[in-house]
Amino acid sequence: MINDLVSDALTRIRNAGMRRLDVTTLVHSKSVEALANILVEKGYIESCNVVEDGVKKTINVVLKYSDNGKSVINEMKRISKPGRRVYKGKDEIKRFKNGYGTIIVSTSHGVLPNDKAYALGVGGEVMCTVW
């Protein structure tokens, strides 16, 4: 049994990128699905779709690579962990890596990237950073 589905999803995407795989499969949860949709929106992965196999759901993620075959994702890092939750206010999540990276935040408005959370004026739990 997996305790932290977000960490598992980040690790699976990171490992698939290092192996230069086209597609990887993630365990489904609402937060992982929201995370994958943000990664698609920000251009870090090509696409994601939810696959239902009876009762069990999974998410198929198609990875994105640059022209020279290198993964578009340089680093994915889990910030808030089950043993140590990290919360930031709206002013602390304004920019990451001078705008080249994204902070993914779980807010009262749902899971949002840092630019949308800042525009809405909400802070929350920092799930991960991607650049």
Curated annotation (Swiss-Prot):
Q: Which organism is it from?
A: Sulfurimonas denitrificans (strain ATCC 33889 / DSM 1251) (Thiomicrospira denitrificans (strain ATCC 33889 / DSM 1251))
Q: Which family does it belong to?
A: Belongs to the universal ribosomal protein uS8 family.
Q: Name one Pfam family in it.
A: Ribosomal_S8
List the Gene Ontology MF annotations in alphabetical order.
Answer: rRNA binding; structural constituent of ribosome
Q: Which gene encodes it?
A: rpsH
GO BP annotations listed: translation
- Record key words, sorted: Ribonucleoprotein, Ribosomal protein, RNA-binding, rRNA-binding
Q: Which domain of life is it from?
A: Bacteria
Q: Which residues form a coiled coil?
A: none
Give GO cellular component annotations, separated by semicolons.
Answer: ribonucleoprotein complex; ribosome
Name listed for the protein in its UniProt record = Small ribosomal subunit protein uS8
Task: Quote the function comment for this protein.
Answer: One of the primary rRNA binding proteins, it binds directly to 16S rRNA central domain where it helps coordinate assembly of the platform of the 30S subunit.
Subunit note: Part of the 30S ribosomal subunit. Contacts proteins S5 and S12.
InterPro entries on file: Ribosomal_uS8, Ribosomal_uS8_CS, Ribosomal_uS8_sf
User: By its UniProt entry, which PROSITE patterns does this protein fall under?
Assistant: RIBOSOMAL_S8 (PS00053)
